[in-house]
Amino acid sequence: MTAPVTVVGEVLIDILRSRDGDAVEHVGGSPANEAIGLARLGHPTRLATYFGTDPRGTRIANLMSREGIRLTPPSQQAPRTSTATAALDADGVAHYEFDLAWHFEMDRLELRRDEHVHTGSIAAALRPGREAVLEAVLRAREHSTISYDPNIRPALMGRPDQVLPMVERFVSCSDVVKASEDDVEWLYGDTPLPQVLDRWTELGASIGAITRGDEAMAISALGEHRWFQPPKVTVTDTVGAGDSAMAGLLSGLLDAGLLGGTFARERLRSTTWAVVQAAVARSLACAAITVSRSGANPPRRSQLPPSAA
């Protein structure tokens, strides 16, 4: 069995409005999507989060139970369950409006040794919860590997110059960092992607990944940059694509024994490109399957092509 994973971050209800105005609700939130993605790929997963006991919250709790994800206490104590309303443009790209409640009690989170801890998105960006999340990550890093996905939401996070210092603080705590090209452009302007990856490496990340939609994913590892082309698919929408990519990447690294405790961190730093490439192949396959379906609906391991399973 691979190392267990604790995901720290928000869960909410995605309200997806199609171009014809119809609305469909899905459980979402980047960290929650990543937790579901990891669980569906066979990894024991916990979610430390914050949502309500209203009907939407009950839907979330029931889904996590069905997916085999354990909620850490006190996850279900919010006054209401957060929502993100996504409207699709002509290209199927989602644009969001948020109604959020986020709070995190680090002292109530019991972190285990030799597990992997993942965080990012709104939970790692909005005060006051972000300071508690950062403290939890710093504490976990003493005995666990860390991954981070900033998943930038400009409407919520302020100006890039206000956000970048906190993003880089999380990067400096992390072994694996993944962001989208849009995230990187918002944070770093016109800085070339290889320079951004080099910056993450300087801060301490062993693997950096930048997704680029249907263009090649940029990967930094072992002192090199490489580019990996995603599979060609018919896109239904892009909701949850980056989350599935992150879950797939972590899954591949977990299977290789490169995430977990401090010994896994050393193995990650000295791995080979063949191992990294296998994890990237799973990442790209997971994202491709997700964009071919409506909403954030990551694949199960049995649905992956043999080359990525």
Segments predicted by a language model, with ranges:
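Conserved N-terminal subdomain of the carbohydrate kinase-like
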Residues: I15, H43-L126, I146, P306-A309
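Conserved beta-alpha-beta core of the PfkB/ribokinase-like small-molecule kinase fold
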Residues: H116-D198, A205, D214-A216
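Glycine-rich phosphate/adenosyl-contacting loop at the front of the ribokinase-like
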Residues: M1-R70, S294
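Conserved phosphate-binding/catalytic region of the ribokinase-like
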Residues: M1-P4, G189-A309
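Short, conserved phosphate/pyrophosphate- and ester-handling motifs at nucleotide-, phospho-/glycolipid
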Residues: L38, S180, G242
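Short, glycine/acidic-enriched loop or turn micro-motifs at the edges of active sites
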Residues: I13, R17, T53, I152-P154, ...
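Short beta-strand scaffold segments in enzyme catalytic cores
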Residues: I36, T83-A87, A216-I219
